Amino acid sequence: INEAGQEQVQINGEKIMFRGTNRHETDDQDGRAISKEDITTDLKMMKQFNVNAIRTSHYPNNPYMYGLADELGIYICDETNAESHIGAVSSNIPSGYPIWNTSVMDRTQNMVERDKNHPSVVIWSLGNEATYQVYNMDENYCFYNSTQWILQRDPSRIRKYERDNRYTKGDRTKSMVDIYSSQYWGVDSVKSQVTNTGNKLPYIQSEYAHAMGNALGNFKEYWDIFRNYP
């Protein structure tokens, strides 16, 4: 907690800033059949360019990657394989339908139990872009169940889910997340978030700068904000 009463992400008592990237397990030559050599090349190149964090978008990665991240000192946001992209339609999956509880919980537990002993893992992500509305925080909502299970199983790590940033200060059991995250916010929106002293949670722009070809823009403007408002 800083002097303004805002929470901070700290590792071993030291405040940190994630300089991260989303990483899919694909290769330009081998497709999804990537080798240990491919993974090693990826992570060593990231270290070379001062990338210190990876979000495993959007599923747990090859176990070899986590051991290498432990060795190289790269933080991991480990993401549950729960994604639908159907949130904009009336059938909204998985939403508040209890039929999805078992499958989402199974994937969450498999990830946590497999990767819990890796010191590189500092964040558990509940999923990606599945459920575009806010539902009651009760046993019918699959992500409420999974976030409460994570909190009980491993309270030492941070929980995140950019589709549901509800939290109650001082009571993690009444919160969906421990860190606020967003995707594809504009520069002005990001600056408003980080300069508003009423926002108490740490903040991550978990997806931005997505481009096809060379159409990327505003990268410097984003990073000016990240560096000026750490």
Predicted features, each with a name:
Residues 45-46, 53-230:
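Substrate-binding/catalytic cleft of secreted carbohydrate-active enzymes
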Residues 1-46, 67:
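N-terminal carbohydrate-binding accessory modules
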